[in-house]
Amino acid sequence: MNTTAQSIYDEAPLGAHIRFIDGTPRPPERFKRKLSAWKERNSAGQLTQRSPAGTGSSPCPATFTLHEGNFGSGGIVILSVSRIFVVTDQRRFEVTSVPPPGAALVVQAWDDHRELLHVAQDRAAAEVWLQQHGYHRAHVEIVGEAETLIKAA
């Protein structure tokens, strides 16, 4: 089911995999540049952060961040690709999956922001990941059954 950027911001849980599309048809493979541009506008990622709207002298709309992937080799990340969307974005979004009940989210929090760092199968795996990566402000949150049912609908 396609939805709006505002709905993703309001309803999708951290860790959800989200696909975004602009509604244009995919060009044939032989048109390399057109296909590359289309892939930039039509992709997917994991919801890692929400930022509230800014107020004051230079207001800005609320945003959310989708993590598209990491690039590197030998277990070393060289480049991490994320994309920020404003809630007024005109593309269509679709939640393709959410973390299952019992999954553990490693979350870093500061002020009124929460950023997802990792999704693990359970608390023990999340604690191991946290020990290996050493984020000092991070904590583990367990995904509940009710939250998953509400967000996946």
Predicted regions, residues:
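Short, structured interface segments
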Residues: L79-P99
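Basic/aromatic-rich interaction segments and small domains that mediate binding to polyanionic partners
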Residues: P25, F31-S82
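Short, mixed-charge low-complexity intrinsically disordered segments
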Residues: H136-A153
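A short, charged, amphipathic alpha-helix used as a generic interaction element across diverse proteins
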Residues: V77-S80, V119-A138
